[in-house]
Amino acid sequence: DYLIGKDPFRIEDFNQNFLRSVYFRGSVIMSAISAIDIALWDIKGKALGVPVYELLGGKTRDKVRVYASVMHLTEDNQKLAEQYQQLQEMGFTAAKIFCNGPTSSTDGKGEFYSSRIEREVEKVRVCREAVGPDFDFVLEVHRGMTLPEAVAFGRAVEPYRPMILEDPVPPDNVDTMAEVASKVGVPIATGERAIDLREFEVLMARHACQYVRPDVCAVGGITTSKKICALAEAHDVLVIPHNPLGPVSTAACLQICASIPNLGIQELPGFCLNGAEDKMVKEPLRFENGCML
């Protein structure tokens, strides 16, 4: 009821009111605030007859490079390599590799430190050989390693030149993430679980990452996302918007990507590749040569 009859152009005012007045502000509440904020930006852009990125300062680029965020459900490295060759043939220049295998197995071998590290490193090696040097990898660990495992794994994959090591350890302890970042040569990305501007400030101030991953559907919408990007710029940190959701999230992310100077790359969820997302919208987004246009 709060918004009924009010001026939808007062986006910052509403955003501040929601953030300050809500008593319990967890991820569910922040997702609701984010949805309202994205809708308000959409209303304003349509009312003024301009894309949202024009309201955010205008374009800094004409296309946005994306990486394929795909779920690979095979333990066969050869089949895995073939999947990445197929992505390359589709025009992608970057993709995610899941390196968060189980820490346990029926024979107990999965619990061995050396065995686990070797298994995940081999996965990266095989994929690199399959696609060659002109392809970037985002190594997704999903917070699945301990500090010593993350350091060992990060150092072991350095020869294969991954672009990003994402969430190697749980980000709740910022000092642990910062220690990993200080000991490996692969840039760290984190922040997909953060729901507050100040969480990102702590991550960057303690040098826990080289890339931040704000989720426009969780941090407070486009309004807060733009602030996080500006904060990252001040810390010389690049931005990789988190985007595991549907077309509204993708469209909102692209408005941000188009308007910031410190974009790293944009995540594109796997279901976008099979046309599922196109069926949800009147005008599907265009993908060409590794970029969204």
List PLM regions with ranges.
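Proline-centered loop/turn at the N-terminus of a beta-strand
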Residues: 51, 65, 136, 187, ...
